[in-house]
């Protein structure tokens, strides 16, 4: 996919992977609109990269999503919708009665899954009207293997993965040219993963590999350890589960 001359909307674009993506999309000749919930972070992003357009919006809020669409439409529309926004709640034992289970799961599903569907639906006709356009949905290495510490987060990413595959096929049935990409990052060094142990890829390296996949029209973009986990889980699912869920994670859940 050609990025030069395209306009990209990045959700969760004020920090981490989203902000690094904005930087590299700009370097590849694209125009970039970012959105997020924190105005201070959006302002800082615009200070760092003055070419960025920033719009405060919460993807999990229907009213905000509609306002975002209206503003983007007034700016001339987009060619690429990059659903990057995601949230992760603290580990909690699902085997104990606790009202927090539902609240956390609902929060993660609203942002990580339902928010994506909402934006895709709002922008679909706009994207269909473009000569070359795309939707990028961000799932996870954990959409292949359950995680005890991120149980409902992983579940939200599995839901998004299945939705993404179906959306791609539905558009093919309609003979639509809108490309549907699934991005599967490994563990990346961001604010969200600060308290996580394990080898972390830098945002710069992750986004570089991501953009390389986009330019090659690689519809499923597995990066770094995600490639290894994908293959291992197909061959040795029990062993792979153990790698993702070491015994020390049991102690966290039991505490």
Protein language model annotation of sequence segments:
Residues 28-43:
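Conserved glycine-rich Rossmann-like NAD(P)H-binding loop of the short-chain dehydrogenase/reductase
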Residues 194-230, 234:
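C-terminal helical subdomain
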Residues 7, 12-16:
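Conserved glycine-rich cofactor-binding loop
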